[in-house]
């Protein structure tokens, strides 16, 4: 099971196959080793890590770009680490703790008593979880940091522990759950070094890489592990139903590494560490399989987040569930034909949305988009995300046992 740190819901076990299922799981105090973030019940004080301040690297542009410099065999990984160590930080997710006990909170939640909501809002900020981040740009008086979305998910405030041991407040510039990326900003006066992105298109299996981050939290900030690129472009399916192309590496990725840097021998960030494979779909324990978001995708997303604060993606304007996820007993109640095995059941159609305007109805089953088979939510997203908002796609639905084709103009999310 590929895991990061986004939620702890158990996924149904599937028989072993070629597909890798990526699930998100918060690494909590009762959790197992699942990947990039470390969560604590409470922490009053952060341990300040030691680090050497590097010469300041100033970037005047308001967006990031991929470097044209390529990795050479003669480069040492020690030199590569020195090129990024001042730019890799610990990201601290802070939440306000309610004054009421866990039992009282549960009772109030179940029976609608929100009298303690104000005490929660005014409660003391405490460390909920930790991850890593990379300072990649200095512009307009701000330092910009890329991290994973799940590292800051649900936070009431965010702090950053710099490589020199100083802790500063950070603001969330933008975040995107689909790619699991987020951008933070801090005052530029605290930035002593920025990392440079390499070109992930030219990666090859067997290349030496290092992972830099804060495994187990800020106590082990600036930890570096070494490995190779196991696969430069591995396609996996995440728990949110999206297909994602990632870099596979055997460099050790531990809780707290999420959002940290995967670095080549030229000292360039070629990926943002995000997930690790804890076990296969049949429950077999797995070692040495971790995944990073390719730098070229990171650059595209962070530039958009800095510019707009969010990522706009095309959608149909429907709520769906894969037929494979509908229990047999419910299929007859939903009037799904017994011979229809694969597809996406439409549970809800947004009023005046693109699908509604095209004539799609609740109860329809999407079987194809642009002639391509749609078997699950991941395949639907994969097709839709290859288009832009405003594009028109041909959607084939099964309605009462008959295929119906409709033209749908994609709307934005």
Swiss-Prot record:
Location(s) in or outside the cell: Cell membrane
Start and end residues of each PDZ domain: 305-401
Database matches in InterPro entries: Chloro_Bact_Ser_Proteases, PDZ, PDZ_sf, Peptidase_S1_PA, Peptidase_S1_PA_chymotrypsin, Peptidase_S1C
Lineage: Bacteria, Bacillati, Bacillota, Bacilli, Lactobacillales
SUPFAM superfamilies hit by this protein: PDZ domain-like, Trypsin-like serine proteases
Residue stretches spanning the membrane: 20-40
Family that this chain belongs to: Belongs to the peptidase S1C family.
Topology of the protein relative to the lipid bilayer: Single-pass membrane protein
UniProt-listed GO biological process terms: proteolysis
Catalytic function, reaction form: Acts on substrates that are at least partially unfolded. The cleavage site P1 residue is normally between a pair of hydrophobic residues, such as Val-|-Val
GO molecular function, one term: serine-type endopeptidase activity
GO CC aspect terms: plasma membrane
Binding site for substrate: 256-258, 316-320
Purpose of the protein: Degrades abnormal exported proteins and responsible for the propeptide processing of a natural pro-protein and for the maturation of a native protein. It also plays a prominent role in stress (heat shock, ethanol, puromycin and NaCl) resistance during active exponential growth.
Active-site residues, Swiss-Prot/TrEMBL: 150, 180, 258
EC number(s) given by UniProt: 3.4.21.107
Name of the protein this chain belongs to: Serine protease Do-like HtrA
Organism: Lactobacillus helveticus (Lactobacillus suntoryeus)
Keywords carried by this UniProt record: Cell membrane, Hydrolase, Membrane, Protease, Serine protease, Transmembrane, Transmembrane helix
Main localization, broad class: membrane
